[in-house]
Swiss-Prot record:
It holds the Pfam family CUE. Residues 1-21, 43-399 are cytoplasmic. It is found in: Endoplasmic reticulum membrane; Lipid droplet. Coiled coil: none annotated. It is a peripheral membrane protein. Residues 22-42 dip into the membrane without crossing it. Belongs to the AUP1 family. The keyword Ribonucleoprotein does not apply. InterPro entries: AUP1_CUE, CUE, Plipid/glycerol_acylTrfase. GO terms for cellular component: endoplasmic reticulum membrane; lipid droplet. Keywords: Endoplasmic reticulum, Lipid droplet, Membrane. This is Lipid droplet-regulating VLDL assembly factor AUP1.
């Protein structure tokens, strides 16, 4: 079967493209906002209950009932009885709350692979293993945890990141399969009306808002037969075999795309997003920019438009460029006429960009260069408009 592309495996847009569904979402928005606030209050009580009660069948049933009030419905089916002696549960990854949902129906815990240890990690329901600096340290900590008697099974997500679950699974990482020779696979599907279940690149806080905003989200868990390692089977081959079993249960393709490929694709797509279109420039703004361009031909129009957007004044913009308040990459000025006399050559010639070739240009001080640039701009302004604003008032005051 042909391997699907990463784009088809990820959810990149949250809102529906169907106009009818979009209208329904807009009509539902006020009710959803009220529902979010109510569920946020109830969710605080659910969190307190999960903290106070010990892990037991009664606690899991109570949390499932309270979670249904939050709009999270969990159903599970077994192809055969679950072998509860297994210490490793393997599942595909759909949302940021998969570990919390599955723990409602089975005693298990999921290690904090990407979440920093602390209160937030504990509050999200992850198993804290201390500060982990490398994958080797993580595996050593998990092996130590599994060696302790009476511990809950580990729920691991070999995909290491979420997909939309419609076309394919990310390549299973091999490190979870090095922890045990027997694993218990399960497949997870998630459904939700109106909007996408999870959008790539969004934080868990954003996903929590939409989880409480939407009327309901249905999680369906399917227990699959336990899988044992074959003689002389490597961790990589073991992972590929379990990936095939889970993908067949979901009706999708087991791909070779890794979590690193997914992260790179999301990053690249984010950089390639088109910039928002700017508002069309008014005729007055264009005329003002042209005046500045005639006085300072070496300044690019993009820099002129940008500064005029802040100042709204031709004289102020010219002053900003002359005094160096606005940085820009100068354009090459085209020569339109013969060179002027030697008396005006020092003022009229454009300043060299970069390292000057003539010795006299290299010995010019910064103040001299600014004065030359100012005189050149003033002369061109006088030739174009007849007078420089502000000088007429000074002459009138002297008279």
């Amino acid at each position: 079967m042909e391997q699907p592309s990463l784009e088809s495996m990820l959810e990149l847009q949250r809102f529906p493209r169907n106009p009818f569904s979009l209208v329904l979402l807009l009509l539902y928005f006020p009710f959803g906002l009220c529902l979010f606030l109510i569920r946020l209050f109830i969710g605080a009580h659910v969190f307190l209950v999960s903290c106070v009660l010990p892990d037991s069948v009664f606690r899991r049933i109570l949390l499932r009932v309270m979670s249904s009030v939050l709009g999270v419905y969990v159903s599970h089916s077994e192809l055969r009885p679950w072998d509860q002696r297994g210490k490793i549960l393997i599942c595909n990854h759909r949302t940021a709350f998969d570990h919390s949902v599955i723990s409602r129906i089975a005693p298990c815990c999921s290690p904090s692979v990407s979440c920093a240890p602390g209160f937030l990690c504990w509050a999200r329901g992850f198993l804290e293993l201390g500060a982990l600096g490398s994958r080797t340290q993580l595996m050593e900590s998990l092996k130590h945890y599994l060696s302790q008697p009476g511990g809950a099974p580990l729920l691991l997500f070999p995909e290491e990141d979420t997909t939309n679950g419609r076309t394919g699974l990310l390549h299973f990482s091999s490190w979870p399969f090095s922890l045990s020779d027997s694993v218990q696979p399960l497949s997870l599907t998630v459904q939700r009306p109106l909007i996408a279940v999870a959008v790539s690149g969004c934080s868990w806080v954003t996903e929590l808002f939409w989880l409480l905003f939407i009327p309901f989200t249905v999680y369906q868990v399917r227990w699959l037969p336990s899988v044992c390692r074959l003689p002389r089977e490597s961790d990589e081959d073991f992972a590929c075999r379990v990936q095939q079993i889970v993908s067949l249960s979901l009706g999708v393709v087991a791909t070779r795309h890794t979590a690193a490929d997914r992260a790179e694709y999301v990053k690249r797509r984010r950089c390639e997003l088109p910039a928002p279109k700017s508002q069309p420039l008014s005729p007055t703004h264009i005329q003002m920019a042209q005046h500045v361009k005639e006085v300072l031909p070496q300044v690019p129009l993009s820099a002129i438009h940008r500064d005029l957007g802040h100042t709204g004044c031709v004289d102020t913009t010219i002053t900003n460029f002359l005094e160096g308040r606005v940085t820009f990459v100068a354009e090459e000025e085209e020569t339109t006429g013969a060179a002027e006399g030697t008396s005006k050559s020092r003022v009229s010639r454009p300043l060299p960009q970069g390292f000057a070739k003539k010795p006299e240009d290299r010995h010019l001080s910064l103040q001299d260069r600014k004065q030359i640039l100012y005189e050149c701009a003033r002369r061109k302004y006088l030739e174009k408009f007849g007078s420089v604003p502000g000088e007429e008032e000074e002459e009138g005051a002297r008279g």
